[in-house]
């Protein structure tokens, strides 16, 4: 059977029709269900009523076990959510500098996942205030429309004590094993930081490598059979981002640091053209493909799983269309249509590489 669809714009006289041909008799094979990873900035919304409801719905809709990834799981604060911010207060220090661990808020987040029968993909970050090399200012100041001049502050800096940082990571994994069981936590993925080639990391690439070594070793010390990886860089189609990913893999190749999966991010770039939103699918696919090429160039790592821990039409979930007009794509059928095309394109790239 051959189906031919004709789509015409609203201004029929001014525009030429677009012809889309669909051959329903041609079988391409099973479409793998690899869209079971979801993420967000504000971890404290996880256990809010709507957060719990949404996570349960995602779990029920998916044929594969859903994974959830959230930012700010280790940051200092009272747990109050805000735009692109959250906190768990898992780590503070007493007057003598002795570590104090408090699992109350982190448990609330992870318990919500467990109750909904989803798995966390733990993004290990960001820096607790007591461990930051630049602790003040610490809480970001940002709202839609603002620049990010006062966003990447104390929580984005390297640790002032790598031994204390390593012990914190060890205690987090150890606590998870004690609470949820070795069998479950073995199946979790632990990702070191987020987008260290950008503002989320106020250190050098070499300092990130050091952070990765310390963090990955702590994860494996607590549970050798779980999975740790990174570097969660964004936009490998850009030369700077590509260089960061390459140097990280070169570092792991030389040092032998644990690396069970490789993660990076692919982003589109919508804009407004002639009064309508035009999506930037080519950029997201270019990021995806360049990352594939970089990983493939390392014989040691070319067979490792690649996880796109963020793959989106654009990069700011908190940026509404009221302030950022290109993001109006979210308010209609353009969004799901884009995602279907993006995932199909990424799967084709996977087959090619």
Residue ranges and their predicted role:
Residues 2-12:
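Sec-dependent N-terminal signal peptides
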Residues 14-189, 205-235, 254-258, 297-303, ...:
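Non-catalytic accessory regions flanking glycosidase/transglycosidase catalytic cores in CAZymes
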Residues 45, 74-77, 129, 193-199, ...:
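Conserved radical SAM core fold
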Residues 138, 143-156, 195-196, 264-272, ...:
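A short small-residue
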Residues 189-192, 261-265:
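Non-cysteine beta-strand/loop elements that form the S-adenosyl-L-methionine
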Residues 201-205, 274-279:
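Short, solvent-exposed loop/turn segments at secondary-structure boundaries
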Residues 233-263, 307, 311-334:
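Substrate-binding cleft/loops of secretory-pathway carbohydrate-active enzymes
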Residues 275-353:
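Catalytic-core region of carbohydrate-active enzymes that cleave or remodel glycosidic bonds
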